[in-house]
Amino acid sequence: MRSEIIRVRTGGREAVHDITAECAEFARDASGGGDGLLHVFVPHATAGVALIELGAGSDDDLLAALRDLLPADNRWEHAHGSLGHGRSHVLPAFIAPYASVPVLGGRLALGTWQSIAMVDLNVDNPDRQVRLSFLG
């Protein structure tokens, strides 16, 4: 297995950050043009990984849906940090902190409109890590 960490800077705001290019480059290099499985994992208790269409408004729609589902207010028992920080600790129950994508011939076998995104509602932690692992 080959594994490495990429760093993502969300800028201290809610974010759906596209990491597809980084994942594709890693998969190409790690696979040597062969087949296998890319596993994407966010080692944080307040972020997730989504396979979603990006750039056509879906990323904004996802953030809007999460704001409706997980409001940034004082209802949360886990109540340190910024207002609504507790919702970030609930996020991984809805958007898992991992995803696996087939790699065929060194290329990610994503659907036409699929991208790989790190989803982060935690405005208190603008610097994130994503672990990419290739099994082949």
Task: Tell me the role of every PLM-derived stretch.
Residues M1-G136:
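Active-site histidine-anchored catalytic micro-motif
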